[in-house]
């Protein structure tokens, strides 16, 4: 039952932002096909290599993407580390303390940057990695449309609505219905 619940909530976390966005914004698939044609392939290869080393990586990346999307949308702010400015990052939030996978995304980003410097956003790399992780875990493969004009918010967001990693399915169901 836990596995089914986890898969359902993972699918909702990944697909809901895309469905909601599609209703209000212009989406463009294949955004990087001319700017960095190898971007998605680089992400695929890097995620595949990470999965060979650790079969738990797909779940970690899907959860990381979920936490990034849940509060205010897909912006990769969950990957930011706290700096000396004393403005805490999302990684310092209690809800995000146990997240695994940022190191994998950092490595993927470095590989993409080596091929196409300053071109592919961290948010898109995380989205591609979550999609590829979903597929590697036995889920579907889907296209990632890109939306320009995302708003970026730095610092710890309100996690009063975010599900805890130890929440029961019934609790998560209530949170998703809010």
Where do the model's predicted regions map?
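Folded extracytoplasmic luminal domains of secretory or organellar precursors
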Residues: 2-5, 13-178
């Amino acid at each position: 039952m836990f596995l089914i619940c986890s898969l359902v909530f993972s699918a909702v976390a990944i697909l809901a932002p895309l469905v909601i966005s599609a209703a209000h914004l212009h989406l463009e698939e294949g955004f990087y096909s001319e700017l960095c044609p190898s971007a998605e392939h680089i992400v695929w290869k890097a995620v595949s290599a990470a999965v060979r080393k650790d079969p738990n990586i797909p779940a970690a990346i899907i959860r990381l993407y979920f936490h990034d999307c849940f509060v205010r949308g897909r912006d990769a702010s969950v990957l930011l580390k706290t700096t000396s400015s004393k403005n805490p990052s999302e990684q310092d939030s209690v809800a995000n303390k146990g997240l695994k996978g940022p190191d994998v995304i950092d490595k993927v980003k470095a590989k993409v940057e080596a091929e196409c410097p300053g071109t592919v956003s961290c948010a898109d790399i995380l989205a591609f990695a979550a999609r590829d992780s979903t597929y590697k875990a036995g889920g579907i493969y889907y296209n990632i449309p890109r939306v320009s004009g995302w708003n970026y918010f730095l610092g710890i967001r309100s996690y009063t609505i975010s599900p805890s990693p130890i929440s029961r399915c019934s609790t998560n169901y209530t949170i998703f219905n809010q």
